Regions:
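Catalytic cores of nucleic-acid endonucleases
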Residues: 20, 63-107
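N-terminal short leaders/motifs
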Residues: 1-7, 54-62
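Short secondary-structure boundary/capping elements
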Residues: 14, 39-42, 69
């Protein structure tokens, strides 16, 4: 039997490093978070966070101007969360980002919430769907962590 060293992480891309810092800050704010969640066909959010009062936040991590400019789907995420945020590093020109969205600035070790995203509460049915999706996504990630050789038959 071989044992996987959970402390050794694979090489992370710049956006994933920002996501790591953001998830640390979200945890400090009392949120649980998952990365790369698909709320609906054609969309994949970088970070979804579930707050202590059931609030749902989506955070999109951008590592460069080119990364931001190539993202034409971000406004499609707004209908899947109570609040929407960008997360960028300290060198990113934040003037490029829409002012009516939230903002984290960080790195792989942490992040700071600079601007709270405006709240648009989800309808009860959408909230139930997203909470279930969050729980399922988290459980499957945990399953694969414990059994990385499993070939899941999840649809």
């Amino acid at each position: 039997m071989t044992q996987t060293n959970l402390m050794t992480a694979p090489s992370l891309q710049p956006g994933q490093l920002i996501a790591r810092g953001v998830t640390r800050q979200l945890a400090a704010l009392g949120f649980a978070s998952v990365e790369e969640l698909v709320p609906t066909r054609g969309l994949r959010v970088d970070v979804m966070a579930l707050g202590p009062k059931g609030e749902i936040w989506i955070v999109e991590c951008k590592s460069s101007r080119a990364d931001f400019m190539s993202d034409s789907k971000w406004d499609g995420y707004l209908e899947w969360a109570d609040r929407f945020f960008w997360a960028v590093d300290a060198d990113f020109d934040i003037d490029l980002l829409p002012e009516d969205t939230g903002l984290f600035v960080g790195d792989s070790y942490g992040a700071e919430l600079l601007r709270m995203g405006p709240e648009k509460r989800l309808a009860a049915a959408r909230r139930k769907k997203m909470t279930h999706l969050f729980a399922t996504h988290a459980a499957r990630r945990l399953h694969l962590l414990r059994d990385p050789h499993a070939i899941p038959q999840w649809g």
